């Protein structure tokens, strides 16, 4: 028996898998390096929001057929997403068709924001024309106005001159929003790092490598600081107009500066679409910010991918530690839960949206 055991052991040793050995000269790309965490802690994945949601930042094709709308609403139900704000409403006939289709089929579940017509901006009567169209769009069911990032960054008139965010030809349109008490959700610029040198010190190096067209060199674009200066000039010019600063104004990584701006502009709010990665790496600072400004921050997601909402819920609702974000190019770091108090969570998820966006049926939400 002892001899048999001695014979088996060498065979067993020979059967062991052979692993690569460490090599100080080995090279691996940033994309390939994806280590599995050796940390074992409690995990509390969340696939459905604790309270009904109003997602104030989404984009959907307004002409989708009934079957596609039914599928969309079913997916929303799974997330506890009660109201989706479609920011891609357009203007004129397109806006009316989008409202008639989406709200006609599901009156309580969708909100449509209008967009402006940027054609013929050189025309002497453009300011009046665009304001009148917006007024008609609101009468046709638009519940807000959305500006995309091209406004200010690369929108130009025929002469080639850049249209600035605080260009006075748009003043009347912003005042129309004040008149009808509908908010303006405005997306200005992009992450600050897209405007900075693409080098080893740039925290968005990987994203710019994968998407070089997102880089904003100074010889082709205004600086990030210039664009933000124009944005806050615009917000300050219209104190009776309610603004929602998209993507936390790209200040998710500098909540101290965002705090100063919220203090300075009482008509400004902010939403969290596409900046969760910044919040999840500073949970204590973010929790304090969300608590202090609990009446000023709204929930938004931007890209419609249901599984990505789970990470938002987990960051906002749990105290989990060191878990993955869903897109490496945004965050090669781990997330930590903010564990927001229930009252703060309710305001983020739906109460602020109910207060700021007119016409949402409040009976769909708890008190």
Question: What do these predicted regions represent?
Answer:
Residues 4-13:
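Sec-dependent N-terminal signal peptides
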Residues 19-29, 41, 95-214, 266:
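Active-site gating/metal-coordination segments in enzymes
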Residues 39-70, 74, 350:
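Mature N-terminal segment immediately following signal peptide/propeptide cleavage
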Residues 53-62, 185-189, 245-249:
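Histidine-centered catalytic micro-motifs
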Residues 53-59, 71-93, 110-117, 143-144, ...:
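Divalent metal-dependent hydrolysis catalytic cores, especially in the metallo-beta-lactamase
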Residues 54-56, 85-88, 113-115, 146, ...:
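Active-site neighborhood of phospho(di)ester-bond hydrolases with catalytic His/Asp-centered motifs
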Residues 60-68, 86-96, 119-128, 155, ...:
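Acidic-and-aromatic substrate-binding clefts and catalytic sites of carbohydrate-active enzymes
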Residues 216-234, 238-367:
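H/E-rich (His + Asp/Glu) clusters that bind or coordinate divalent metals
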């Amino acid at each position: 028996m002892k001899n048999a055991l001695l014979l088996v052991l060498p065979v067993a040793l020979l059967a062991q898998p052979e692993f690569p050995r460490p090599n100080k000269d080995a090279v691996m790309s940033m994309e390939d390096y994806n280590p599995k965490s050796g940390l074992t802690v409690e995990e509390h994945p969340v696939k459905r929001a604790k309270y009904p949601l109003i997602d104030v930042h989404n984009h959907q094709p307004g002409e989708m057929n009934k079957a596609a709308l039914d599928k969309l609403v079913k997916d929303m139900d799974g997330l506890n997403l009660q109201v989706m704000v479609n920011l891609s409403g357009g203007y004129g006939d397109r806006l009316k068709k989008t409202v008639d289709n989406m709200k006609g089929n599901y009156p309580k579940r969708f909100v449509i924001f209008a967009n402006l017509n940027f054609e013929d901006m050189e025309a002497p009567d453009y300011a009046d024309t665009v304001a009148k169209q917006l007024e008609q769009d609101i009468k046709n069911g638009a519940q807000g106005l959305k500006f995309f990032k091209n406004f200010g960054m690369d929108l130009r008139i025929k002469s080639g001159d850049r249209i600035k965010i605080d260009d006075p030809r748009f003043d009347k349109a912003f005042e129309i929003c004040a008149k009808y008490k509908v908010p303006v959700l405005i997306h200005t610029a992009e992450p600050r790092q897209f405007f900075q040198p693409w080098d080893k010190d740039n925290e968005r190096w990987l994203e710019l490598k994968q998407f070089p067209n997102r880089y904003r060199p100074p010889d082709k674009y205004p600086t990030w600081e210039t664009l933000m200066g124009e944005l806050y000039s615009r917000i300050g010019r219209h104190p009776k107009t309610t603004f929602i600063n998209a993507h936390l104004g790209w200040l998710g990584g500098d909540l101290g500066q965002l705090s100063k701006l919220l203090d300075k502009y009482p008509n400004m709010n902010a939403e969290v679409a596409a900046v969760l990665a910044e919040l999840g790496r500073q949970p204590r600072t973010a929790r304090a910010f969300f608590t202090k400004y609990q009446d000023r921050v709204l929930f938004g997601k931007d890209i419609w991918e249901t599984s990505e909402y789970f990470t938002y819920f987990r960051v906002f609702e749990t105290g989990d530690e060191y878990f993955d974000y869903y897109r490496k190019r945004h965050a090669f770091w781990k997330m930590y839960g903010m564990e927001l108090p229930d009252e703060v969570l309710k305001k983020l998820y739906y109460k602020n949206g109910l207060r700021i966006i007119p016409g949402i049926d409040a009976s769909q939400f708890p008190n």
